[in-house]
Curated annotation (Swiss-Prot):
GO terms for cellular component: plasma membrane. InterPro entries: KdpA (IPR004623). PANTHER family: POTASSIUM-TRANSPORTING ATPASE A CHAIN, POTASSIUM-TRANSPORTING ATPASE POTASSIUM-BINDING SUBUNIT. It is a multi-pass membrane protein. GO terms for molecular function: P-type potassium transmembrane transporter activity; potassium ion binding. This is Potassium-transporting ATPase potassium-binding subunit. The gene is kdpA. Its main location: membrane. The chain crosses the membrane at residues 1-21, 66-86, 127-147, 166-186, 245-265, 281-301, 327-347, 354-374, 377-397, 416-436, 482-502, 531-551.
Length: 558
């Protein structure tokens, strides 16, 4: 019952909050201008931008240059961190390949961690590298999404200014909400300190080092920005990051808020005046929520069903391996599905210990990469499936393929298909390389089907910019650091460039057909068609390899 109440409440909050995002996205005046305008203007002066509207090509150039500069600075700081200040625990520099992976991971909003949070980075790099990139990577995804929506909806005839979009989102959305969430987490017991690790003597007489630090400030943006990188190696399964059920709900709600609000924002932009959400966006929301609930049901059923091997021994009950007793199987399954649907990657349980079908659920969500998804980018990926559905359905019934009164032509379809293919190609090709390259498969710690699942999950998590993992995999090696780094880089930037190209190409076309010659995108049957095409297209792509992994493990586990 508490899960139903929580999900209902988050949908309502996201719907209301999308109205505020509408004013932020369209640079409309609001009551908070007096608070934020001066700070924004100061940021614009520091950046040196004149706030002139950019072309799509210029927008992408500045987006890539901004991200490239941040990535370079991050890489340098990680390989020299031991010689800098705010390192009371004397943590060492990262190796070249690990720093490459870490920099790309946080730059692309993936937060895939091949290092231990306690010893792999210093307080300085946690705050000015990890936390900073959690803000900017999230805001970058939002900015390019808003640029795409401005073009698709035709609400304005400009694409916007990249620096204005990213600064306004950080100042007016991320910073205020992060401060609020940090305070709420601190009230629940999440630490926020610059003191060195505690050294205590246990009851058995041994010396124990307890790691903590500025956790609350990172924890808030980690979930709000759908980042996922943990301050500690155990991530949100540790009491210092996620002490109790209330902090658990706060963190899950933080993950869901902005991606769901972005979908409602799209609906408000379609309705022109922003007072209501267009029916088309509501259809998309219901379709995605249906898939979300279906995967959640599968995961919870599998986890509550438990391990059949233990059942044969007379030990019945839910699967509690790798789970925190304070959360149990139910909230652990909910957190797992939310963190993979919204591509956050934080965990409150160990995904490697999930049952076969329990691990299949989050893996499928990352393979789809459209069920709400991350900040902005998730909606952009969903719109690619929407365009595919419109094109195929239109041709099936003999109507003109148009979306929002814009004809979909051969040029757009080439880009759409390329965006669709990038994701599975990266996952499947690099997974195959993991078994072909000598030494790479030595990182696998489980034989047979589950070992294949470990590899598939790691590559899928990198391609979806998620960051969670089957952590039985020994992934801090040269192969895994370089391969997943390349995957995260390509899967982030190539689709974004193509998606903005698609939007700019569509907006230059005008429809010469009446509504009766095009399919209706605001009817329930379109939502059903969208679900069917998502399942069919992804199923044909990934079912063979899933049979070798979690499905095969499920069928043989007796």
């Amino acid at each position: 019952m508490e899960i139903i109440l929580f999900l209902t409440m988050m949908v309502m909050i996201a719907y209301v909050f999308s109205g505020y995002l509408y004013r932020v996205a369209l640079v409309q005046s609001s009551r908070v201008d007096l608070i934020f305008t001066r700070f924004e203007n100061m940021c614009f002066k520091i950046i040196g931008t004149d706030l002139e509207h950019m072309s799509a090509k210029t927008y992408v150039k500045h987006f890539l240059a901004f991200n490239g500069f941040m990535g370079l600075i991050t890489f340098v700081l990680l390989i020299v961190q031991q010689w800098l200040f705010l390192n009371p625990n004397h943590n060492l520099n990262q190796s070249i390949d690990l720093a490459f992976n870490t920099a790309i991971s946080f730059l692309t909003n993936s937060n895939l961690q091949h290092y231990n949070g306690e010893s792999g980075v210093t307080y300085l790099t946690q705050m000015i590298v990890m936390t900073y990139l959690m803000f900017t990577s999230s805001a970058s995804g939002y900015a390019v999404c808003i640029a795409m929506l401005r073009r698709l909806t035709g609400l304005t005839n400009i694409i916007g200014n990249f620096y204005q979009d990213i600064v306004r989102f950080i100042v007016r959305v991320l910073l205020p909400l992060s401060c609020l969430i940090s305070i709420l987490l601190m009230t629940q017991g999440v630490p926020q300190t610059l003191h060195a690790n505690l050294m205590i003597r246990t009851l058995s007489g041994h010396i124990q080092h307890i790691a903590f630090g500025p956790i609350a400030s990172l924890e808030s943006i980690k979930h709000l920005g759908t980042n996922g990188g943990g301050f500690l190696a155990g991530n949100s399964a540790t009491p210092f990051e996620n002490p109790n059920i209330w902090s658990d709900f706060i963190e899950m709600g933080s993950m869901m808020l902005l991606p769901m609000s972005m979908l409602f924002l799209f609906g408000r932009m379609l309705s022109r005046h922003g007072k209501r959400v267009h029916r088309h966006a509501l259809i998309l929301f219901v379709a995605m929520f249906f898939i979300f609930i279906a995967i959640l049901t599968l995961t919870m059923w599998s986890e509550y069903r438990g391990n059949p091997i233990l059942a044969n021994l007379g030990i019945y009950g839910p699967n509690m391996e790798g789970k925190e007793v304070r959360f149990g199987a139910g909230l652990s399954a909910l957190f797992t599905v939310i963190t993979t649907a919204f591509t956050t990657g934080s965990v409150n349980n160990m995904h490697d210990s999930l049952t076969p079908l329990g691990g299949l659920g989050p893996m499928v969500l990352m393979m789809l990469n459209v069920v709400f998804g991350g900040e902005g980018v998730g909606l952009m990926n969903l719109l690619i499936y929407v365009l595919l559905t419109v094109f195929i359905c239109s041709l099936m019934v003999g109507k003109t393929p148009e979306y929002l009164n814009m004809p979909i032509g051969a040029r757009e379809m080439k880009c759409i298909v390329l965006v669709f293919l990038i994701h599975p190609i990266l996952i499947l090709v690099f997974s195959a390389l993991a078994f072909m390259i000598p030494g790479a498969s030595e990182s696998i710690t489980n034989p047979s089907f589950h070992g294949i699942s470990q590899v598939m999950y790691e590559m899928t998590s990198a391609a979806a910019n998620n960051g969670s993992g089957f952590e039985g995999l020994k992934d801090d090696t040269t192969f895994w650091n370089i391969s997943t780094g390349i995957i995260m880089l390509l899967s982030r930037y190539i689709p974004i460039i193509l998606q903005l190209l698609i939007a700019s190409s569509l907006v230059n076309k005008k429809s010469y057909h009446q509504d009766k010659y095009t399919i209706a995108i605001d009817k329930p049957y379109f939502g059903v068609s969208l679900i069917v095409f998502i399942v069919l297209l992804s199923g044909l792509t990934f079912i063979p390899v899933l049979l070798l992994g979690p499905i095969g493990e499920f069928l043989t586990l007796k």
